[in-house]
């Protein structure tokens, strides 16, 4: 995905994986692809990481005509991103997201949002990042940041646009994932949809949907979804221990559950 992004922009990678410093091969590969790498403690979720990058590279961003803030919640690209970036540049809006959501207040989903020069130079944009707090609870972060920032930018007179959805309600990337890909050319698949699927959406056809468009990506997702060998051995030991019964008590079964 980084290789695809760098076709259209300089990539600044922010990572909370402190152990990355001790993996020289991985770091070398990333340095070949990224304009800068920031390694920091995991504070403030995505917005804390973006704030750190914006602060460290303020000079470059002040001169930028275009900025995209995105996270690692996507698998992709399902198809090349040429069409997406053409639409981003062609949009008359100042702030462009991929999807929107009506929860709490109409806003753009924060997983991928592009800001044009007018937004970057807007006083409300700078004030938001300067005064941003590290919210310990994700629910508070969603209200104050994912919802709060678009609301403040709209109030400041900026124009906002969602490219793939209009007035969506809830996590459209879960309940409408297939339609978005097949009918609208959405180039990503949400990681949490396959790893966790909290609302039990029908996802059985994802290998075909993705495989028809990007077989290499489908194979990579399959590999990442496989439980690690050490985890499998742990689960097997737990099953053997908990499934033993002397006929006097209840029986418990633990099944593996992937965690993001």
PLM feature spans:
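ER/Golgi luminal nucleotide-sugar-dependent glycosyltransferases, focusing on the catalytic module
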Residues: 1-260
